[in-house]
Design a protein with these regions (language model features):
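Local sequence-structure signature of Cys/Sec-based thiol-disulfide redox active-site neighborhoods
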Residues: 1-31
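Thioredoxin-like thiol-disulfide oxidoreductase module
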Residues: 24-40, 45
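Generic alpha-helical hydrophobic packing signal
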Residues: 3, 32, 39-41, 58-64
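Non-catalytic, surface beta->alpha helical segment in thiol-disulfide oxidoreductase systems
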Residues: 46-64
Length: 64
């Protein structure tokens, strides 16, 4: 499983999302800025599929 995460500096939920990905041992590539299809950060895709922000990522990983 590989993820991409769009973040900006000093974003607390971006930091939490990266920590969550680390906790679940999900390899990820970090991209700075906003995803063109999403207006908030963080924004996460896993294996090319949209997941959403921190809340959606938490739910996704808990349901693995």
């Amino acid at each position: 499983m590989k993820a991409e995460i769009w973040t900006i500096e000093q974003c607390p939920y971006c930091i939490k999302a990266k920590q969550l990905l680390d906790l679940f041992k999900v390899e990820y590539k970090e991209r700075q800025g906003f995803h063109p299809d999403w207006k908030t950060v963080p924004y996460v895709t896993i294996d090319g599929n949209p997941v959403g922000g921190f809340v959606e990522l938490t739910s996704f990983l808990r349901n693995l």
